[in-house]
């Protein structure tokens, strides 16, 4: 009996060695034909943690779970008209440029306001802009920019405005069933691999439409077919809620609106989280406003009555004064922002220390430059 078991083990071992050798030969042939890295074991990947770029909003970074938009993935931002979709995308553009990257904006709607983009922190002199004549042209331009590997972020505004060339050449009233959906499906198949390979973030802004004859369930849908829904790693539903009234002389006028951004799909973190932000007209997302709210909830900023304080020092009476104080003291803003990110697990302790060191060096350099400037003036 023992001899029989031993013989079976030897046969199994021999068979296993032959299979392993056959696999190694197959892997060598694949690498020879398609290049190194065409097939690999999952544990051998150098970067197992998903790389992200901040969205430009602390609340949205927290809702996304990973700390921002995942690199090498497709993002869809959709919602009703004037809900803040383009504003959210422009904050991503400003953040990409802030981190030293190159951003491109495919303006299919031909409606981008350069002054508003600049107000949100976008360097319009460095932003690559295209206003294509057709949907195919816009997607082809986006594809060439992504294939170059030099662009960090591409924004397409919007999918609904990517009109197929056949529809443009035809007459109004002609039926073009499924043309846009086929165009988007082909584009997704073509672009997805290149986006992942070059680690480019591709943001597609989309509109809403109503399904005809829906009696039960949500009648809302997005144009462009289903391909984008499948290929997108993150889908954001942006909706404005209540108007923000001004104070003093502006108490009767609206100066912004509270907006909810729901993560309806997320392949890199748990979905269905909601970010509540304030979008101020002409300014974009109030970064100081969201920081005061989140830091107060975490007791990083202490609130006693109407007063807000940090580390025992009062920073303002009322949220507006606290926001103004943080806007005037960017080094304090960065310090509190880092503490919030560490609290939510978006940064490790070591990353916090290095970020604080960089911020300290920048502050010292700024002070030195100011001193030198004073000496030159004298």
UniProtKB/Swiss-Prot annotation:
Gene3D superfamilies given in the database record: P-loop containing nucleotide triphosphate hydrolases
GO MF terms held by the record: ATP binding; ATP hydrolysis activity; ATP-dependent DNA damage sensor activity; damaged DNA binding; single-stranded DNA binding
Binding positions (ATP): 79-86
Pfam families attached to this UniProt entry: RecA, RecA_C
PROSITE patterns the record matches: RECA_1, RECA_2, RECA_3
InterPro entries per record: AAA+_ATPase, DNA_recomb/repair_RecA, DNA_recomb/repair_RecA_CS, P-loop_NTPase, RecA-like_C, RecA-like_N, RecA_ATP-bd, RecA_C_sf
Subcellular location: Cytoplasm
Chief localisation class: cytoplasm
Biological process per Gene Ontology, one example term: SOS response
UniProtKB keywords: ATP-binding, Cytoplasm, DNA damage, DNA recombination, DNA repair, DNA-binding, Nucleotide-binding, SOS response
One term under GO cellular component: cytosol
PANTHER family referenced in this protein's UniProt entry, alphabetically: MITOCHONDRIAL DNA REPAIR PROTEIN RECA HOMOLOG-RELATED, RECA
Function: Can catalyze the hydrolysis of ATP in the presence of single-stranded DNA, the ATP-dependent uptake of single-stranded DNA by duplex DNA, and the ATP-dependent hybridization of homologous single-stranded DNAs. It interacts with LexA causing its activation and leading to its autocatalytic cleavage.
Record NCBIfam families: tigrfam_recA
Family of the protein in this entry: Belongs to the RecA family.
Protein name, entry field: Protein RecA
Higher taxonomy: Bacteria, Bacillati, Bacillota, Bacilli, Lactobacillales
Gene responsible for this protein: recA
């Amino acid at each position: 009996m023992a001899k029989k078991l031993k013989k079976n083990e030897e046969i199994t071992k021999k068979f296993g060695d032959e299979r392993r050798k056959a696999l190694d030969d197959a892997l060598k042939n694949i690498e020879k034909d398609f290049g190194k890295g065409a097939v690999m074991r999952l544990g051998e990947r150098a970067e197992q943690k998903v790389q992200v770029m901040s969205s430009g909003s602390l609340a949205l970074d927290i809702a996304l779970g990973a700390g921002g938009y995942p690199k090498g993935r497709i993002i869809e931002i959709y919602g009703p008209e004037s809900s803040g979709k383009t504003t959210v995308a422009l904050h991503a553009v400003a953040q990409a440029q802030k981190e030293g990257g190159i951003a491109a904006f495919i303006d299919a709607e031909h409606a981008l306001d350069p002054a508003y983009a600049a107000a949100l922190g976008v360097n319009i002199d460095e932003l690559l802009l295209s206003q294509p004549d057709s949907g195919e042209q816009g997607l082809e331009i986006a594809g060439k920019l992504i294939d170059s590997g030099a662009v960090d972020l591409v924004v397409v505004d919007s999918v609904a405005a990517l009109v197929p060339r056949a529809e443009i050449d035809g007459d109004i009233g002609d039926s073009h069933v499924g043309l846009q959906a086929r165009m988007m499906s082909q584009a997704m198949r073509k672009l997805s691999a290149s986006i992942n390979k070059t680690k480019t973030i591709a943001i597609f802004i989309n509109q809403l439409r109503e399904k005809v004859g829906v009696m039960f369930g949500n009648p809302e849908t997005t144009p462009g077919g289903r391909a984008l829904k499948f290929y997108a790693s993150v889908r954001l539903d942006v909706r404005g809620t209540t108007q923000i009234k001004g104070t003093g002389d502006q108490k009767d006028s609206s100066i912004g609106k509270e907006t909810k951004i729901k993560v309806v799909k997320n392949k890199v973190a748990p979905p269905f989280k909601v970010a509540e932000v304030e979008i101020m007209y002409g300014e974009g997302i109030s970064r100081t406003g969201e920081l005061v709210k989140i830091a107060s909830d975490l007791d990083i900023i202490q609130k006693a009555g109407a007063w807000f304080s940090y580390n025992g020092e009062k920073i303002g009476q009322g949220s507006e004064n606290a926001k103004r104080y943080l806007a005037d003291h960017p080094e304090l803003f960065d310090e509190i922002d880092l503490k919030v990110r560490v609290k939510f697990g978006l940064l490790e302790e070591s990353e916090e220390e290095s970020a604080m060191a960089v911020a300290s060096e920048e502050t010292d350099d700024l002070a030195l430059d100011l001193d030198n400037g004073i000496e030159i003036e004298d």
